[in-house]
Amino acid sequence: MVISKRAGGRRAAGGAAAQAAPPVNRGIAKADWREGFKKPQAGVSDMTLLTQITNEAVNDNLHKRFSNAEIYTYIGNVLISVNPFRDLGIYTDEILRSYRGKNRLEMPPHVYAIAEGAYYNMLAYKENQCVIISGESGAGKTEAAKRIMQYIAAVSGDTTGTGSTSSGIHTIKDMVLATNPLLESFGCAKTLRNNNSSRHGKYLEIMFDANGSPVGATITNYLLEKARVVGQIRNERNFHIFYQLTKAASPQQRELFGLQGPEAYAYTADSQCLDVPGIDDHADFAAAFEAMRIIGLTDDEQMSMVRMLATILWLGNVHFVENAQGDAELANPDVTAFCAYLLEVDPSAVQRALTQRIMETQRGGRRGSVYEVPLNPTQAAAVRDALSKAIYNNLFDWIVARINRSLQAQSQTAASVIGVLDIYGFEIFENNSFEQLCINYVNEKLQQIFIELTLKKEQEEYAQEQIQWTPIQYFNNKIVCDLIEAKRPPGIFSALNDAVATAHADSSAADNSFMQRTSMLSSNPHFEARGSKFLVRHYAGDVMYNVQGMTEKNKDALLKDILNLVDSSSNAFLIGLFPERPDPNSKKRPPSAGDRIKASANALVDNLMQAQPSYIRTIKPNQNKSPTEYDTQAVLHQIKYLGLRENIRVRRAGFAYRNTFEKIVQRFYLLSRATSYAGDYIWQGDARSGCERIFLDTGIARDEWQLGVTKGFIKNPETLFALETMRDRYWHNMAMRIQRAWRAFMRRREESARRIQRAWRRSREGHEFLELREYGHQLLAGRKERRRFSLISMRRFMGDYLDLNGSSAEGRMLRASANLPPNEPIVFSARAQLLVSRLGRTSIPSPRFLLMSPRAVYILVTHLVNKRPQTTCERVIPLSTIRQVGLSTLRDDWIVLQVGTDEGDPLLHCDFKTEFVAYLLQQTGGRTHVVIAPQLEYVRKGRKKAHVSFRKDESIPVGDVYKSSIVSVGSGEPPTSVSRPPAKKLPRSAQPSTKRRTTSRPVTSRRPVPTVLPTTTASRGLPPAPGGTASASALAVPTTSTVAPASSASGNASGARHVPAPPPVSGGSGLPPYLQAPATSAPSSGMPSYLQRAVPAAPTAPAAPAASAAPTAAQSTSGIPSYLGSSTTKLAPPVTVQQLGSSSTAQTRSVPAPPSASATPAVATPALAPVKAAPLPPPPPTGRRLPRYRALYDFETQEAGELPLRTGDIVELEEKEENGWWLVKKGSTEGWSPADYLELIAEPAAAKPRPPPPAKPASAKPAAAPARVSQSSVTSSWTPPDSHAAPVAVMPGMGDPGGFAAILARKKAERAAAAEQAHVPE
C-alpha cells in the first residue's frame, strides 16, 4: 500500500472542482423560463417602425399600447407619454436602477431613459442639456418633470453605482427634490381637466461639476395665475395650499391666525369644490412643511408665510355694502379688524385703503392736489382682490427666490447644466381671457422651438452641409407667434398696451379701444375678430378669447393706496414682499403683464436654444381622467397639432447624430489606430479626413454616415451607441492590457516562489507521518517481525483511512453511526476484523470498522436489516480504560486491547496495527503498556480467560490464518528491519501524460517490446488484480491481423512474425527489482496476494532436444519465469496498455512483477539455435478469471460507492462480504451491489489445444498457417521481424504445442537446408 496523501483528499478536491465547474454554453445564454410569462408587447415601441405613416396609424399604435398599460413610445429620441390616470408601478427604485448606464435601445421606452440620455450626454460631451415637456393641460407634464428630477438626483454624484455620495451632494439632491412638493402646493390647483394642474411655469436648472455631481440649482418662475386666488369657476379649486392649511393647520396656527375650515372662506368655498379624489390635503401639507425644513426655511419664515396665507383668506371674507350716497361701506368691520391684526397695520388704514382712492392731479392749475375719492362696492371689491392677488403673487416669488438662495449657497462653479421645463399646457375653456392667451402664447413658443430644432433647422442644416435629403413639408407656427408678440406690424400684446395707454382710467373704454385696434390684425389668416371676442387659430386648435377685463389684467398695476398700506405695516416680512416701487418722476410707461410674459418667454427660448434638447410630448387620453377610457378623436387632434406624423417622417429620413469634424475626432479618435496611439492623437491630416478614417476603421457601413462641409452625420442611433460603447471600452481594454502584463509578471514571480516552496515541501512532505512511523518502529523495539509493505519508503501513517474527517459519504455514515459530534476529530479509522465467539464452534473473525478519537475507540458493525445494510456502534472503549495492548512476535496483524471489563477484551485483526498502536500511545501520552509475546492472554465475555498462540507456517504466503486459538502466519522481515530509503524520482516526461500519443503505431523505445501473437487465452486476458493493477498476461495484446499465407511474402515463407531477442546486458541479473524473482522457488512470504495472482506460474520446461543447448542448473533454479526470457536479457520497462493499443479489458497501468531478493545470482543463457522439429512445451496454465455474475433486477444507487445495475448486466466479482454486499466490477467501474441481485454465470470448459499438423517432405512447399482472427478489435504494435532469431513463446498462451511456433521452427530449418544445398558445388 503506497499512500502519499490523506484518504479522501483527492476525491474531495475533485468533487469540489467538479461542482464548481461552470456549464459549457459556448457563448449562448441559457433560456429563461420566465420569458414565456412576460406580457406581450403591443404595437411598436418606436413609431419610426410603423409601416404606414399616418395620423390614424399613430393613434392606433398609441391606443394599443395604452390598453396594454404601456404609456411610453418613442419617435426616435422623442418620448411620447400618454397619461394613464393611475399608478402603474413603473417608477420603483429597481426599475430606476435598471436604466442606469443603458442607452435608449437597450431598455423599453421610459422617462428614465430620457433622463439617462440627458445626463450621459452632459458628462460625455460637456454640453448643457434641457428636457422640454409639452402637451395640453392634464397630459402629465408635471409628473414627467418629477420623474426626471427623481432619476437625476438618484444617479448623479454616484460614479461607483453603489448609491454612496458625499453629504454635501446628498443635501443638494434632497433640496432639489424638496422643491416639488413645495411648489406644487403653492403653484398647482384643481381644474376641470386636471386635478393637479400647474398654474405657473417652472424651469429648473440643476448645476453639475465636472464629475457629474450636483452643486446647485436655479428655478425660474413664469406667469403665476394669480387671478385664481380670488375666484374660480364651478368645480375648480384655489391653490392647494389654502385647502391644506385650513384642513391640517396645527392648533397653535389656528389659535394665532384664526384659521377655520375651507368652507368658512369665500376664496375657497365659492367654487363648491373642497375635496378632490386622490388628493390627501393633510399628507400634502405635512410634505410641504417638511420640504420647507429641507430647503432651510426657518420657523419664523414659515410662520410668516402662514400669516400671509391667513391674511388672504380673511381678506376674501371682507364684504361691502352700498350707503345712501352710493359709496362702499364695510359690511363686517370685525373681519376687517382681524385682517389689520394679521397685516400688523391700523384698522382704519385698512378701511381707507379698501373704500377710498387717493388721486393726485397731474395737470391744470391745481396740479399736485390730492383728493380722496370714495369707491363703490364693486370698485372696493376689486381693490380687495388686487391686494390679495398681490400678496400671494409676491409670496410665491419670494418662495422661489428663497429656494434659489438656499441652492446657490451650496453651489460652486458649475461645469454643466440640465434644465427641466414644467410649464402649463395648452388650454381651451368656455371663457378664455388674458391668462389663457398668455399660457397658449408660451406653448406656441415651445412648439416653435420644437419645429426649429427638429424640423426646420435640421432640414436647413442638411441643405447647408450638402447632404442628400428629401425635404419634408410641415406647419411652421411662427406666424401665430408673430400675431401675438410682434411690434411691427403690431400684435395682440402691442394692441393691448396701446389701449391701456390711451384709456387707462376706464377699463371698459380700454377694452373697446383694444377691439378697434385689432382690426389691423384682420389680414393675418390666423386671427378673426367677432364683436367683443376674437379668435386665434393656434397650432393646437382655435381658441375664442373674451375681451372684457383683458386690458385691466394686462395693466397689472397696484394702486398707490395699497402700497401705502403695506408701508405702514410693522411686519418686516410683508414689507419685504413688495420691494419694487414705481418711480413717480419717471415718464416711462411701466411694463405690462404682456410685456413681462413676452420677455420671460423669449428669455426661456434663448436658454433652451443654448442647450441640447430632449423632448417629451405628453398626450391626454380623455377629458374624464379615466384610467380605461381612450378618446380616439381627442387623441387624434393632439397628434395632429403636436406634429407627430411630420416628426416621424423627418426622423426616418434624417440622421440621428451630427457634429463638427473637430468634435467627432476629439470624441472618437481613440477608435482608430491611424489616429491614436496609447491615448495620444497622432493624425497628421485635417479633421475631415480624420473623421473619415475613424468611420472606416470602426467598420461602419457606408450608408450609415455622411460627411458634409463642416460636420459629420450618423444615420441611426444604434451606430452612435456602438461607437460610444467602443469608446467606453477603450480605456478598460488599455487597463486590462496593463493588468494582464502585471499579472503575468506577478504570476511568474509567484510561480517561481511556489516552485521553491514546492521543492521544500516535497522534501518535508508528510514529515509528521514519517515521524509517527518511526515512533511505531520504536514501539516494536525490534521484537516483532515486520511485513514487507510496512517497510516501503512511501509507507506513511495517515490515520483516517475511512475519511471521517472529510466529506465522503462513507465517512459521514460512519460518523453518524458512532454518534460522533461534528467537532470531534478522528485520529484513526480503518477496516478491521473482530474475533467473535460462537457457541459450540470455533471463533471466527468478523468484519468491523475500527475508529479512534482523542477520547475513545469505537467498533462498528454492519448487519442486514430488511436486506439492507445498517451500520451500528457495537462498542465504545474509552482510552482511559485500555490498560495494555498485546501484539505477537510474528508478522501477523492481531491486536489485543486489554480493558478489564465484563464485555471482554477485543481481539482485533487490522492491517494497520502498528499505526493504530502508535496513535493510541500518542493520544494516551504513552501511558498504555505494549506487550509483545508469542502467546497473548485476553479475557472473553464474562471474564473468562483465553489465550491465542502464534506460529510460523511457510505454506501461508500472504496474511495469516486463525483456527482454534492458533494464528498461523508465514515468515516476515527481520524484527530489526527499518523502512526503506525514499526511492529516487523518475525524470519527468517532456509533455503531460494526457497528451502522449496512444495510437496503434509501434511504441518507440530504446529497447524493443515483445510482440504477442493472438490466442484464445491471450485475447481474453486476465481480469485486473485488486487495487487496479493489471495481471501479467494482460500485457499480451491481441492483434486483429491474420497470419499471412506462405505465398504472401518472399523473404518469410511462413509469414510469421519473429520476436527479436532483447540486447544482452553485462553483469547483474538484468531485471529490475520489481521483476526479479526470489532466490527460492517458494513464493515470498511478504508478497501480497494480488501480486502473486498477477504473475502466472512458470511453465514446466520439456526435455531439450539434442541439437539445442542444455540449460544450466542455475537457470533451472533461478525462479525467473520462462516467458520473461533469460536472466541475462535486459527486459524492457513495463509498457502501459495505452502504449500498446490494448483492448478495453486491459488496464492502463503497467504490470509490476513480483519483487525478488537482491541476492539472486545472474545466470547467462545461451542463444537458442534453430532446430528442425523441436517439441514445444505444454501451454502455461491460463490466468485465473474472476467469477462473472448476471444482474437479475435493476438496482438504483442510494449512496456513493454503490454500483448501479440494469437487468442483464454482466459483472465480475472481486470481493464478498458477509453482510450481503459484494464488491463487483462492470467494465472499468467498480462498486458495491447486493448479492441477492446477482446470478452466477457458468464458465464454458477450456478448449483443448490443437494437435500439430503432420510432417511433410522437405521438398514440398510448406502449407500456410491457418489464419486465426483475434477476438479483440484493437491492433497491437509490432516490431520488425528478425530472420536470425529463433521463434519462442514470449508470453504464456501465445502459442500451442506443435502449432504456430512449431511451423515457424520447421520452416526455418527447411530454409537453412535448402540454402546449404544451393551452395554445394557440383
Swiss-Prot record:
SMART domains: MYSc, SH3. Its main location: cytoplasm. It is found in: Cytoplasm, Cytoskeleton, Actin patch. Residues 966-1090, 1137-1162, 1246-1300 are annotated as: Disordered. Transmembrane segments: none annotated. This is Myosin-1. Residues 42-728 form the Myosin motor domain. One of its GO terms (biological process) is actin filament organization. Residues 1184-1243 form the SH3 domain. Belongs to the TRAFAC class myosin-kinesin ATPase superfamily. Myosin family. Keywords: Actin-binding, ATP-binding, Cytoplasm, Cytoskeleton, Hydrolase, Motor protein, Myosin, Nucleotide-binding, Phosphoprotein, Repeat, SH3 domain. Residues 786-980 form the TH1 domain. Phosphorylation of the TEDS site (Ser-369) is required for the polarization of the actin cytoskeleton. Phosphorylation probably activates the myosin-I ATPase activity. The gene is MYO1. GO terms for cellular component: actin cortical patch; cell tip; myosin complex; plasma membrane. The myosin motor domain displays actin-stimulated ATPase activity and generates a mechanochemical force. It comes from the Eukaryota. It comes from Malassezia globosa (strain ATCC MYA-4612 / CBS 7966) (Dandruff-associated fungus). GO terms for molecular function: actin filament binding; ATP binding; hydrolase activity; microfilament motor activity. The modification Phosphoserine is found at residue 369.
